[in-house]
């Protein structure tokens, strides 16, 4: 009947994530990052950008985006290590959905991405319809 303050905050955060979703696009290629940014902005997402893994980790910790799309092969800190560190920071409980993207679709890469904590693995070049299906499969409305 009565909700605790914690329940109200969690409900508020969940509703905010649904109504005003944000995405962190972590990609070292300017062209790919720009394409992904525009695609998400057209669907109403607020977009944070990172060009390397260290930036991605800092932005993710600070802003807690609704979704992360991360290239697995980035400078400074690669995508797998970035995801591993972020999952450690998140701890138990609700985890931010993560879509891994890579041009290096070699044997074992998908398994490594999923074992590290990514929810979905996509190969480059990015097909926007496939990305859209992936995002929707994670429970996002757009």
Located regions from the model:
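Non-catalytic signal-transmission and effector/linker regions of two-component phosphorelay proteins
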Residues: 1-24, 129-142
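Short hydrophobic/Thr-rich beta-strand motif most characteristic of the beta2 strand and flanking loop
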Residues: 44-51, 59
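Conserved acidic carboxylate
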Residues: 27
